[in-house]
Amino acid sequence: IPVGKDSMSMRTVWEQEGEALSNTAPLSLVISAFAPLQDIRDTLTPELKTTAGDTQLVLVDLGRGKNRLGGSALGQVFRTLEGTAPDLDSASDMLALFSLLKAARSEGILLAYHDRADGGLLTTAVEMAFAGRCGVTLDLAGAAPIEALFSEELGIVVQIGRADSERFTELANEAGLGDCTHTVAAVEANDAGRKNPRLTVLSHGETLYSASLSSLQRTWAETSYHMQK
């Protein structure tokens, strides 16, 4: 057994309408798989590339716009875990996602990759910005901000060159994922941006949020700091 898993004793406690409730997760089977890596230089990581010219972040949303918030980190912060939790509604979408990634990698158009997981799209973008030490501007367009930023639906975020955007869209359409593939952010690549990088969130052209990466990283590290004291 190469790794351990806490599902054998995982328990959660919460408060609902003044009553303390708890739930213990059922036993679950965990299968770990490994594969040889031919060349580590081809590895995709969350580190944003800042020397690739004009680039953007693209979300492939396997939740297909449902943006369910049940059980999310946002809900935990506000002590409310009600609502429908994210789920994989179509197993074929997962297979299609792997096909899309394989095709895009083979053409060399993927620069960075990260999953949308705990914390949702906002956390994904922040982690990628931390790794690349560069600014990111999220543009939510007409999406509901809270759901778009904090939903933990299955999905991935990839960095691609703007010149490759049309080709990536073609590949997504071929994989059957074109209608859930959206450009969500611009990556700051110039030197001025790297000196004082910021994370900015736009909606309908207005700034909803903006903060320096340094302040966000201090907040990010605070919990770990207190745990380690």
Outline where the language-model segments fall.
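Intein/HINT protein-splicing elements and their conserved insertion hotspots or analogous self-processing inserts
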Residues: 3-150, 165-229
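Short, solvent-exposed beta-strand edge segments and adjacent coil->beta transition regions
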Residues: 153-155
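Helix N-cap motif at beta-to-alpha junctions
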Residues: 157-166
